[in-house]
Curated annotation (Swiss-Prot):
EC number annotated for this UniProt entry: 4.1.1.37
Function: Catalyzes the decarboxylation of four acetate groups of uroporphyrinogen-III to yield coproporphyrinogen-III.
Protein name per Swiss-Prot or TrEMBL: Uroporphyrinogen decarboxylase
NCBIfam families: hemE
Top EC class of this enzyme: lyase
CDD domains (alphabetical): URO-D
A Gene Ontology cellular-component term: cytosol
Positions bound to substrate: R27, Q28, A29, G30, R31, D77, Y154, T209, H327
Segments crossing the lipid bilayer: none
Amino acid sequence: MSELKNDRFLRALMRQPVDVTPVWMMRQAGRYLPEYRASRARAGSFMDLCKNAEFACEVTLQPLERFELDAAILFSDILTIPDAMGLGLYFETGEGPRFKKTVRTEADVNALHMPDADTDLGYVMNAVRTIRRELNGRVPLIGFSGSPWTLATYMVEGGSSKDFREIKKLAYGQPELLHLLLDKLADSVADYLNAQIRAGAQAVQIFDTWGGALTAAGYLEFSLAYMKKIVSKLQREADGRPVPVILFTKNGGQWLEHIADAGADALGLDWTTEISEARRRVGDRVSLQGNMDPAALYAPPAAIRDQVSRILASFGSGSGHVFNLGHGITPDVDPEHAKVFIDAVHELSAPYHQNA
């Protein structure tokens, strides 16, 4: 593998000195880019983009051609595991992801195929290898998965949900059945992420998009416990350097102390938590990633720079911060505004690293 030319993202995750604060964006390869829309039209569908290594590589690299990003993230979907388990993933226009089958009974859980990450999900590993080769050491590559709880919400509900009624029926009425499902998912996610690391991912992120829908006790029992299990099983070194792990629970700001004790290297923050407060609460146990409101990218350039400046000042001096949005970039954002954001992070953060 090529030597890494820009490692500030990995260094910041490990709280090592950096020259400027590194930055990347969730969904940085996505519909806001006209070149992405052109690639998707050529591929035919979203899943065709994901399952073809050349297309997945092409769209992963597109934002790096436009912006001075400090990391690339594998282009894929969090629902690849449930799809490989036999649930039949498809996308309904205007409805988002759907499954042909749902998982609501013990028989449904027992019928799930336990996927082999290197064969059933081999298309993902092919994409990782292709992207690493094409990156040629330019920036690190992030692999990822959904959290067991988040994957389970889609599997039980049959797709996206506003109130999580069906999975909460299990949580309150048949918790042992939900634990059976979550345990299977935790094993699959750990295998999947380790396969990505073997294929070349240099950091991994677990997206717990719907953890914030739980009560405090429910979060610890049904979400965080299974992310901890995954973290404990991950390969934490490759190519002679650490492979950092990031946990991101949307709307999880009230549980930062618990998440900081889960064994990961960094926590993702959404925009509802003040980053200075988060830093005070977790100390130097973990790095922090985030946390500008994606909607701030609709603002004029000067206002975007002001938002970046405010968050940098809130975090303060020293390493341990990876700048990001608090969730994915939205499809109707002007790419030029994304460029203003990324350039502002590098330009305005240098004074905070003068003693590096």
